[in-house]
Amino acid sequence: MKASAVTAALAVGASTVLAAPSIKARDDVTPITVKGNAFFKGAERFYIRGVDYQPGGSSDLADPIADADGCKRDIAKFKELGLNTIRVYSVDNSKNHDECMNALADAGIYLVLDVNTPKYSINRAKPKESYNDVYLQYIFATVDAFAGYKNTLAFFSGNEVINDGPSSSAAPYVKAVTRDLRQYIRSRKYREIPVGYSAADIDTNRLQMAQYMNCGSDDERSDFFAFNDYSWCDPSSFKTSGWDQKVKNFTGYGLPLFLSEYGCNTNKRQFQEVSSLYSTDMTGVYSGGLVYEYSQEASNYGLVEISGNNVKELPDFDALKTAFEKTSNPSGDGNYNKTGGANPCPAKDAPNWDVDNDALPAIPEPAKKYMTEGAGKGPGFAGPGSQDRGTQSTATAEPGSGSATGSSSSGTSTSSKGAAAGLTVPSLTMAPVVVGAVTLLSTVFGAGLVLL
């Protein structure tokens, strides 16, 4: 979604610090945790079976979790599909979300949430300017709004900010945002909610970005990594699609890995990839994925068509339902990597990977108070934005500076001698990737909402 330049300043009252909202959340929900390179629900391996959910897309931005009636309408379809997770790209952090989140919890459905909006996000063309205290106040307020729900599975710190070689120079700012979110969650004494990044469907630097998000000190590392993948276009297979090579490339990776978008629509969608994604061919490395997308929008990826209170199932709905019904999760733990662990940071390889060193920008000075005082009230969709406002970072962070009281939510070792240490960047010999329209037309803004 193309965000317009923001010219009005967002006034954040430094003297008025509001407590996190009082949330009446379900107590009988089992939170999802991280062990090694996998997600767990209690003692049981958890595989994401979900869809991307943003009715209206970028042309009619709305918060689906604040729309209780629409949420309950769609939960009936989620249950019919057998989903356990939805991803939402943008929410209004000034609104109440209790009714929908509790209804999702009652249905056994978890939320993976992008903290950004088109107006509050890292601009890949101006990452230094857009990484500022006004931006951090917004995303921290979003954490406040959702941390109390036990079915909040994870937060995305960014979506497709890096979409080619040159834009990889923004990677330190994406990683800094991830660090800041993790520190905020711990400093505010919330439960350990995983934070990670959703990468674009590009071969250029996908693996380097994954390595980068899992290198350095524990406070600098992500809790998981996800990427969008439209390379399996039916009719295809595990090998023809190149997915076998991706499994090979990511074998030994120390963080949970899943597909944040999948479902090529070049041909008729049969979702043949589902049988591979939840088989032992992949479950040692992958933890499932999210199908793009629930509602029919301009890019024609929809499973259903929504008109007011009416929901019409499209052919892809039945195809996905059938694919899920035919595919069970593997028994046991799916051969996950129990050790986990950090890997070395990738070396600069311009123009594909244009990151000079491992240093990250320090959190902007005015944003430090949020760690102890809280972020205060979120401005919501009506806020003026943060792209060109606020105080920027003026220093380089010391490793460990983003630490806070509490253990790592990744539950993995910070040593580069762990199982992930052998992860190396292969030559780009994968099968040709058919990139979805979402990636091809993504804008210069690394907004949390990139829908077409």
Curated annotation (Swiss-Prot):
Record key words, sorted: Cell membrane, Disulfide bond, Glycoprotein, GPI-anchor, Lipoprotein, Membrane, Signal, Transferase
Q: Where does (1,3-beta-D-glucosyl)n 2 bind?
A: 160, 201, 206
- What name does the UniProt record give this protein? 1,3-beta-glucanosyltransferase gel1
Establish whether keyword Glycosyltransferase is in the entry: no
Q: Write out the catalytic residues in the record.
A: 160, 261
Q: Which InterPro entries match?
A: Glucanosyltransferase, Glycoside_hydrolase_SF
* Residue ranges of the region described as Disordered: 325-419
Q: What is its EC number?
A: 2.4.1.-
Q: Which residues are glycosylated?
A: 249, 337
Q: Which family does it belong to?
A: Belongs to the glycosyl hydrolase 72 family.
Propeptide residue span(s): 420-452
GPI-like-anchor amidated alanine lipid modification positions: 419
Q: Which Gene3D superfamilies match?
A: Glycosidases (3.20.20.80)
| Modifications after synthesis and translation | The GPI-like anchor contains a phosphoceramide lipid group.
